[in-house]
Amino acid sequence: MVRGLMKFPGISTKLLNISVNSLCKFRNLERAETLLIDGIRLGVLPDVITYNTLIKGYTRFIGIDEAYAVTRRMREAGIEPDVTTYNSLISGAAKNLMLNRVLQLFDEMLHSGLSPDMWSYNTLMSCYFKLGRHGEAFKILHEDIHLAGLVPGIDTYNILLDALCKSGHTDNAIELFKHLKSRVKPELMTYNILINGLCKSRRVGSVDWMMRELKKSGYTPNAVTYTTMLKMYFKTKRIEKGLQLFLKMKKEGYTFDGFANCAVVSALIKTGRAEEAYECMHELVRSGTRSQDIVSYNTLLNLYFKDGNLDAVDDLLEEIEMKGLKPDDYTHTIIVNGLLNIGNTGGAEKHLACIGEMGMQPSVVTCNCLIDGLCKAGHVDRAMRLFASMEVRDEFTYTSVVHNLCKDGRLVCASKLLLSCYNKGMKIPSSARRAVLSGIRETVSYQAARKTHIKIKAAIECNTLMYP
């Protein structure tokens, strides 16, 4: 790109802007900066669009401070930031919920003699809503926007409808929608926002009504619309209706996100349609539309392990590596659990060791899975060594170890571990306490169990006083 620029000394600022914009879109800010310097050396001076493009790139991919630093360079070049400049900065700050920074930029814009536009106010209003400060958000809508002589558009109302739905006021959102229809034309996004709110409230009848409204307005549901409904059908156990919608989407060429596909596969398995589940996952992974989604591979990996198809597991893991996908915590947990289920405890331990060798920290869930599997296979000592090596443990870690120590007859060790949990203020399920006391009562004596119970009760009461 830079060499190409050097070859054409007659290039314009417009071409420079196109090149900078292209590099920024691909997150190559360093090359964009180099291109800008080369352009200046050739006498191609940047304009406000050039700097605004850089600022937008920095706010999206680097940080607000780095983006703001560009405004100083603008002024040094004799170019004053405009409303677009501040909108990019405000958007970057609002995205990270940096309200004070947003307000500071608003003040700076006003002091510079610039008037915020609807984008500016929409971004500020959205930030207030996301922070739960609805009063200030409504003040912008009812006062600030009108004082500025601006008229709210559908973008503004989309923000308001989304906030109402997310805060549980779906009925208010529907009433506002009915009121707005005579004033502004709803967008497809408007309907998707309301359908999402109704789906999360599990109001199936209202969702059907909103779909009819959407079609009456001349819109065609898109992948977002259908995927939202698909998730609701499966969450509300309307499996057949969900599968019908899935087949309709598939027929019409829609693509799905990882969650939707996993939900479909899970529903197919629950209804005894394992072959269709395999076919669905194979199509998803091989089609290329979701080939970069590790969630999809995780689902297929889990299916292969459950079916005992280890050759397919090996092939799939090789494919994941070839495609450059990065296994997540769930991938590693599936592998460890799958190896444990076929009795390969050594392989499960080796896989956990490999995670550490790759410079990653195994998740607590993966470690918990291995500890429980080792104990169930009778390798309690190996499980305890892993337990001792863990830097982070949760209540499930302790609960699993206590239960398994009791099953192995190591009641003294189990009771000491349980007491240490209560002394630290941890909330351990009562089932662990019952397992310890029952074991001591049956194998030692009722009196010993009574003494342990008194110690546990004292530890719980002590921590209740310290952390009420």
UniProtKB/Swiss-Prot annotation:
Q: Which domain of life is it from?
A: Eukaryota
Q: Which family does it belong to?
A: Belongs to the PPR family. P subfamily.
Output the lineage of the source organism: Eukaryota, Viridiplantae, Streptophyta, Embryophyta, Tracheophyta
PPR repeats: which residues? 12-46, 47-81, 82-116, 117-152, 153-183, 187-221, 222-256, 257-291, 293-327, 328-362, 363-393, 394-428
Per the UniProt record, the source organism is Arabidopsis thaliana (Mouse-ear cress)
The transmembrane residues are: none
The record's section on Pfam families has:
PPR (PF01535), PPR_1 (PF12854), PPR_2 (PF13041)
Report what the protein is called: Pentatricopeptide repeat-containing protein At5g46680
Q: Which UniProt keywords apply?
A: Repeat
